[in-house]
Amino acid sequence: MVNTVNSLAVAAACCASASAFVAPTTQLVRPAQPSSGMTMQAAKSKSLPFMPQPATLDGSMAGDVGFDPVGFSSWIPIDFLREAELKHGRICQLAVVGFAATDLGLHLPGAEHAVSSIAAHDAAVATGAMPQILLWVSAFEAISSVAVVQMLEGSGRAPGDFGFDPYNLSKPGNEKKKEDFELKEVVHCRLAMLAFSGMVTQAVLYNSGFPYTG
């Protein structure tokens, strides 16, 4: 009986040793496939590689590089954010030109207009022009808000689209050109917002005109 048990033990050991030289089956070595949820969690922002990719920034919008460190896109509609970005960017593009032009001596006739860009604010308040500017800006905001509300309700309007299309980019066949122009506008908008902030800061710090270098 003892010899039989020993024989079985030796046979089992030999089988185990032999199995080490046999190639494992596919089923045994098949790696676990990552779930889509794990893949999404692993995705990183293109602009901020140390932060996760915002769920609402999928790259479909022009200039979308996943930059949202504060997380605004998680609780504010992305179309509203793009509308605000384009509006502020367009205003700053005009402001950069107007700010520099004023300090280069281009202004309306009259002594009341012969002031620097920085001094123009106080001059407008003193003459009563500032309330008029506020009134007109408020009127334009009220009118444009109708289109924004309709957009958020699903009208299909693209953010920042007010029907101004002098190059006929909306016509069939111009899709690629339209995408190119949309990207360029966003890039210029962002640059103008930074540039205007820098120009105002430099003008105040150095109390000088263009190019605001002291």
In which residue ranges do the predicted regions lie?
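Alpha-helical transmembrane segments and their helix-helix packing motifs
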Residues: 3-7, 14-16, 21-214
